[in-house]
Amino acid sequence: MAYSFTEKKRIRKSFAKRATVHQVPFLLATQIESYTQFLQADTPPARRKTEGLQAAFNAIFPISSHNGLARMEFVSYHLSNPPFDVKECQQRGLTFHSALRAKVRLIINDRENPGKVKEVKEQEVYMGEIPLMTSTGSFVINGTERVIVSQLHRSPGVFFEHDKGKTHSSGKLLFSARIIPYRGSWLDFEFDPKDILYFRVDRRRKMPVTILLKSIGLTPEQILAHFFVFDNFTLQSEGAQLEFVPERLRGEVARFDIADKNGRVVVEKDKRINAKHIRDLDSAGTKLISVPEDYLLGRVLAKNIIDPDTGEVIANANDELTEALLENLREAGVKQIQTLYTNDLDQGPYMSQTLRVDETADQTAARIAIYRMMRPGEPPTEEAVEALFQRLFYSEESYDLSRVGRMKVNSRLGRPSGEGAMVLQDEDILETIKILVNLRNGKGEVDDIDHLGNRRVRCVGELAENQFRAGLSRVERAVKERLGQAETENLMPHDLINSKPISSAIREFFGSSQLSQFMDQTNPLSEITHKRRVSALGPGGLTRERAGFEVRDVHPTHYGRVCPIETPEGPNIGLINSLALYARLNEYGFLETPYRKVVDSKLTDEVDYLSAIEEGKYVVAQANATVDADGNLTDELVSAREGSERETRMVTPDRVQYIDVAPSQIVSAAASLVPFLEHDDANRALMGANMQRQAVPCLRPDKPLVGTGIERTVAVDSGTAVQAMRGGVVDYVDAMRIVIRVNDDEAVAGEVGVDIYNLIKYTRSNQNTNINQRPMVKVGDHVARGDVIADGASTDLGELALGQNMLVAFMPWNGYNFEDSILISERVVAEDRYTSIHIEELSVVARDTKLGPEEITRDISNLAEAQLARLDESGITYIGAEVEAGDVLVGKVTPKGETQLTPEEKLLRAIFGEKASDVKDTSLRVPSGMSGIVIDVQVFTREGVTRDKRAQSIIDDELKRYRLDLNDQLRIVEGDAFQRLERLLVDKTVNGGPKKLAKGAKITKEYLADIDKYHWFDIRPADEELAAQLEAVKEAIEQKRHEFDLAFEEKRKKLTQGDELPPGVIKMVKVYLAVKRRLQPGDKMAGRHGNKGVVSKIVPIEDMPYMADGTPADIVLNPLGVPSRMNVGQILETHLGWAARGLGQRIGDMLKAQAKAQELRTLLSQIYNESGKPEDLDSLSDAEVLELANNLKKGVPFATPVFDGAHEDEIRRMLDLAYPDDVAREKGLTASKQQVTLFDGRTGEAFERPVTLGVMHMLKLHHLVDDKMHARSTGPYSLVTQQPLGGKAQFGGQRFGEMEVWALEAYGASYVLQEMLTVKSDDVNGRTKVYENIVKGEHSIDAGMPESFNVLVKEIRSLGIDIDLDRY
């Protein structure tokens, strides 16, 4: 097995028992692929598929004028290069976008001869700006990173369901069907409690379904023929003969004696007809049964009956037979009649009853009825009626089932899936009603709407396409109106197309849609999880209030597609989910998961992706099935899922068709990072998965000693760790950049063979956490494509590292860890283990006001010298300044309005020309409760305003950095070129050259070294071909120089042009403060198993419980937090972490003793290769083994994959290996080595029983006490109630609520209560009076009338009740 550059630095020992045949796919693929398909930017126009932008253009164009003489056709579109890159957009507050231009053709026909083309105009038209996706799957909108969350919505198609007996008091099941298109009107069919079938369009008034059937051209006879089978009767003078159909009589009670053709009675009256009776009648060759007259009465006619002589209609289809009607039929000589066959069991008379309720006569009347329902009050003209009916379901402009919808309709109605129009067809409506009637008759099953075969994912590309199409259709309307003038006014395409509607639709979607969210950027995991989220909320989705339990619940089809664990707690539970690790979307937007094919009980290497619908056809075994070395299933019975319900049952191996690809395939990325997940209760696992997303990146990231093996995948896929784009040799490294000279075989001809990686340094994330990248390569290192070359936030050697490994003891400690509180050693704080850096952005703008422009300046009166010392001559603080609350960061003065001056002031002004009072100080100051170091300043100046020195120096620094990059590229390009030249020139004969090189002389290496490299081009080789090569190299270098000069000039132009600022803003300054947050009491911490708590006390290191060898614990947790929470995973993690720490110490001791590489190999082999997944240590050189050992000193990292992790005996084995008996005795370990005798740090006495001690990976969460702590004496008040505002952001007070009032009442603290409800709250006069009294030194309260009482009086008056206050 080949290890990558970073993997071999620290190999994670894996306990996985099963080899993976299928690698975890790229975690951001769903988002990136969806948007790539939407744009198709890199695909030539001729080869673009009909999807995304192309589909939207194709759907709207061509646009024809109302008179048909002019039309506009779409040719192609292209996206220009973005004007600014991602970083520049973030700094300037711009959107990272590309301009969309479409080539359109305007065709104008001749007025006299409409068939003849008069003129054709083709032009490229600007169609607005389309935001581009960054390489990590996010969007930069107005300078902030946002994510478009995928939406899980009900798929278009036809669905059948019932109300579960909730509608009617009897509990009767009322069946309904719904045809949902992608775009257009919904069509519902529903039974009412009287079993009459109705339909409704777009949830409007319901109407009998036969109206709809008549409107599509069916007569009552045809309707009955579609839904019923007929009984054939031959009328006789008395009674009739019924055509014998055996299955129709079975189960009925005979209403008369039934005889065979010989007259023998087979079934007596009032007896139930059973199978034997049917057989007897059948064997006797019975074809007809004589029935009495009353058997005919009440039966329903299937067809119109017409008098053969007169042609008059005697009876209509759906009429009931009565004695009078039978008499008329006999008189008219009618012999044969057909009636509807119905029964109470499986052939109800529903359509017949519905026809009776329906009062419309024919197709026209039916369509008019539909028109009146859709457009009440409008007169139904023939054209209007026809147009509306066509537009409802048959017009491609207003109705679209989409490919998915057509596929779902066809598969549900039992047709070949891919065929059919995208609009509704008559057969679709008829078949749907038939299936619904069959359901009511007890045949077939209703659909499960929570099945993932009936819910699909709308990804970024599709959501953006819908918005673009909406904008384009607004453009279409405007173009249609103006096309008529195109000929007369000689207009060009750009005169007709206004791109504003498109831009505004796109801007609205990306800026303010419910699915466009501010990216959660706390750490790499939260970033990746946000992009893999699927939400059932949003436009066209569910709402929190209406979503019931079933929608939120875990469904069997979620297996391998949606994570059953990771979902928010609270009102959104179950509505917002995360994609499972291996899930992907198919072409229809349904979620698929991979399964490994099994043939004849043997696993193959073939992997198939199955959607929820396809999976229902197969028997799928679980990944933990026992498999031998050859891949055969060995158990007699295997646990597998089968049937549409996906119930788990035991099956024989020969029935298994597929098996899971990995045990972790059912969970999401966040849940798969929890080791021993299988031992945690589901609720706590949910909290653990969610809290990892809130972990704040620490100053020094520390990889988890106990991981799951997925850490590297998450770190790399999130984009926070830098990967090498191409293999090569590291040429230059510093903290800011890495330069790699690309391998010859990977370099593309004509391109620069240099990759430069500018690292992100101390940059603010959306959540104000710090993003910082650190190089992990040295000059001369060989790296391959995809190797991690720099660590980012929360990554350690290319692995995700959200927290720190802490030595944890489970024991109570003086009540300080009561109720999940956490006790922490002072050492943890002193070593900065949980110190994090947070970056705050503070900005100030100078505007043009009515009284004159605001000015950013150092010249501010009444400002202390100490404050001014921090500002440069432009009035802006310098980088590196340490500032505290209230310090000035940017000096700014605002013109003040002219005020009435006193005579004295006028005199002073006349004498001294005192002007200082004309301006007021509006400088940017550090907010209260904040202190830090200024790490960056950015100045933006409007076009036309001269830059100050500070702004100019920032631009100069940026250009210097860019020039450095270009110089490095040029240096390497030239270096490669001159090396190649040297190989070409050495030992070649010349005609002459610099330094008097004689004709016929041979070139030597020494000669070339002696002259300047640029003089090599002056050498005149004798070989003409060589001379041509020499010239070609010279031209190539000059070409590159020219390109770099152009690039530099472009960059300079970009930086020196004025910035786009909001209207009225002259200058904007942004100051970035780095705030260091140490761990302190009140901060929230958590493990990965949902074990969360608040730091209660930081204890001096000498008072912490310690081991026999003097090692103190870092954290003391309460053991009572484990049993009731049922998250035993944390105990197993602690034991395995303890083993990892011990093994690291053993390796460290060996390195101290300068052990040979072979000894190290022996120990490493015992650790890595005696259980779990073996590692190829022999492929490492001795130097690499030594580097590996050095990186393992702090602990050997373990991987225990979810559902395939370490077993108890493996943990014991590792503990025995880590702590041989002599070491165990020295440390005071018990025989199991899982517990240890601890001593009280304060008394030195041993605790009375052994304590579980080990290493746990603990996280500091983004709920820091510094952000929550807040105090107020006086501050802002609410305008109406005059009560203090609430919350830290408003500088509010503490609410004294109803229950608190009760408490003071209970204690009888009347004066405290009066003070609380009046002068401390909303008694305006009382508040000022108290202040006056305090100033005077009088400590008394004069409580007045609370403002809230006045508000109450006003509210009562608003009801028209005159209420007044009698003051005595």
Curated annotation (Swiss-Prot):
One example GO MF annotation: DNA binding
Reaction it catalyzes: RNA(n) + a ribonucleoside 5'-triphosphate = RNA(n+1) + diphosphate
UniProt keyword Ribonucleoprotein, yes or no: no
CC annotations in GO: DNA-directed RNA polymerase complex
Signal peptide as annotated in the record: none
E.C. designation(s): 2.7.7.6
Enzyme class, broadest EC rank: transferase
Keywords annotated in UniProt: DNA-directed RNA polymerase, Nucleotidyltransferase, Transcription, Transferase
Function per UniProt: DNA-dependent RNA polymerase catalyzes the transcription of DNA into RNA using the four ribonucleoside triphosphates as substrates.
UniProt subunit comment: The RNAP catalytic core consists of 2 alpha, 1 beta, 1 beta' and 1 omega subunit. When a sigma factor is associated with the core the holoenzyme is formed, which can initiate transcription.
NCBIfam families: PRK00405.1 (NF001616), rpoB (TIGR02013)
Similarity field: Belongs to the RNA polymerase beta chain family.
Official protein name in the record: DNA-directed RNA polymerase subunit beta
Biological source species: Cupriavidus taiwanensis (strain DSM 17343 / BCRC 17206 / CCUG 44338 / CIP 107171 / LMG 19424 / R1)
Source species taxonomy: Bacteria, Pseudomonadati, Pseudomonadota, Betaproteobacteria, Burkholderiales
